[in-house]
Structure formats: structure tokens, C-alpha cells
Amino acid sequence: MNRCWALFLSLCCYLRLVSAEGDPIPEELYEMLSDHSIRSFDDLQRLLHGASVDEDGAELDLNLTRSHSGDELESLSRGRRSLGSPTVAEPAMIAECKTRTEVFEISRRLIDRTNANFLVWPPCVEVQRCSGCCNNRNVQCRPTQVQLRPVQVRKIEIVRKKPTFKKATVTLEDHLACKCETVVAARPVTRTPGSSQDLRAAKTPQTRVTIRTVRVRRPPKGKHRKFKHTHDKKALKETLGA
């Protein structure tokens, strides 16, 4: 019993010394030590062990909170730096006029235009083509050296519900060299009065369309039955005058 009281007094003195030198001791620990439930060294160890576990957990939670808040602030600062800082953006480089690898689709028209009931394998291949931009809109990136390359593909047909494989040859076009060349644009034709085309049109004789009116002659009227047999015109006039 005396040993427990000695340990208790020494612990109180140690706590006072620690509180004077460093962080303050929690009041809960003094309340637990002042309780008469401590009857043995094991009770004191259990009490201190439980208190140390609680303190370690609180310290761990505090450290985690500090670390998470620090990480969040650091990530937030990085995000602001990447979005708002102009030093992150790299200078833009022009896409030079040169040969680049492109994907070329092998269509069925290149193999057989009369039949469409087959498949081509492989469906696409890689070719070298000129691409890029030039310094002026009046020039374009065009190939200056071209090479034709024949390749062999498979033509797969379904005959009587069974696949048949045939070989076919397709000629591919590869660009070996490129250059920015001037594009000759078609100039719009502006006609001015007195131009050569107008003079030619003036010299060309114009055909006049003349409309003729054709009079349709009516058939002669027949003689009356009374004067049908009178052939002498003079006698006929005298008869009519009478």
C-alpha cells in the first residue's frame, strides 16, 4: 500500500514537472488519479495505458487532420498554379511540311468494283503522306516525290456458308518528299464593255425571224339551182338585174 502511495506521489510530481516544461496536462488525468479506485500498481498501469491510448489517438487524429489539410492546400495551390500560372504553357510550334505516318483504309472498290460480298484483310494499313502547314495561305504542302508500293491483302468470300481466301494486290502511294508550293487559283472573269467577247458578239450576224401571214382562200360559192344551167355571164347579169 505504501508502494502505491509513493508511486502516486512521484507520478503527481512528474506530471507537475512535465506541465511546467511542455504541454499542459489534461485535467481529466488529474481527476482519474485523485479517484480512490486506484488500489494497485496494475490499476495505475491500466489507467495510464488507457490515458496514453486516448492521447495517442487524439494526437494521431490531429496529425491526420493536419496532414490532410496540408495535402488539400498543397493540391489546391498546385491546381491554381497550373490554371493561372502562364509559365506552365509551352510555346506553340508550327507543324512542318513533311511526311508523316497516316492510316489508309483499303476499301473493296480497290479490289473488285463488281462484287461487294467479300471482306478485306487487313482493312487498313499505314502509308507515308505529306502533311503540315506553310507560312502563307497561298502555298500548300504537296509531295514532290512519290513511290508506288504494291501490297498483298486477303479477299475473304463466303461460298456455300464456307469462307474462301484469295489473294489480291493493292497499290499504295507513299510520299517520300514534301515541299510548300504555290497554289495557282483561278481568277474570276470580269467582263468590261468593249471587250473582245463583246466585239465578237457584235460582229456575229443576227438572224431575223420574219412572220408571213398566209391567207386561206375560201372555196368558190356554187351557183343557185335556178341559174345553174346559165353559162353566159352577160345573160346572167341581165337576168339578175331584171
UniProtKB/Swiss-Prot annotation:
Main location: secreted
Sugar-bearing residue positions: 63
Pfam families: PDGF (PF00341), PDGF_N (PF04692)
GO biological process: cell chemotaxis; cellular response to mycophenolic acid; embryonic placenta development; heart development; metanephric glomerular mesangial cell development; monocyte chemotaxis; negative regulation of gene expression; negative regulation of phosphatidylinositol biosynthetic process
Region ranges (Disordered): 219-242
Residue span(s) of the pro-peptide: 21-81
Molecular-function GO term, any one: protein homodimerization activity
Keywords: Cleavage on pair of basic residues, Developmental protein, Disulfide bond, Glycoprotein, Growth factor, Mitogen, Proto-oncogene, Secreted, Signal
Protein name: Platelet-derived growth factor subunit B
Signal peptide: 1-20
Record-level GO cellular component terms: basolateral plasma membrane; cell surface; cytoplasm; extracellular region
Disulfide-bond pairs as recorded: 97-141, 130-178, 134-180
Keyword Glycoprotein: yes
Subcellular location: Secreted
SMART domains, sorted: PDGF
Biased composition (Basic residues): 219-232
Segments of skewed composition (Basic and acidic residues): 233-242
Role this protein plays: Growth factor that plays an essential role in the regulation of embryonic development, cell proliferation, cell migration, survival and chemotaxis. Potent mitogen for cells of mesenchymal origin. Required for normal proliferation and recruitment of pericytes and vascular smooth muscle cells in the central nervous system, skin, lung, heart and placenta. Required for normal blood vessel development, and for normal development of kidney glomeruli. Plays an important role in wound healing. Signaling is modulated by the formation of heterodimers with PDGFA.
Family to which the UniProt record says this protein belongs: Belongs to the PDGF/VEGF growth factor family.
Oligomeric and partner information: Antiparallel homodimer; disulfide-linked. Antiparallel heterodimer with PDGFA; disulfide-linked. The PDGFB homodimer interacts with PDGFRA and PDGFRB homodimers, and with heterodimers formed by PDGFRA and PDGFRB. The heterodimer composed of PDGFA and PDGFB interacts with PDGFRB homodimers, and with heterodimers formed by PDGFRA and PDGFRB. Interacts with XLKD1. Interacts with LRP1. Interacts with SORL1 (via the N-terminal ectodomain). Interacts with CD82; this interaction inhibits PDGFB-mediated signaling pathway.
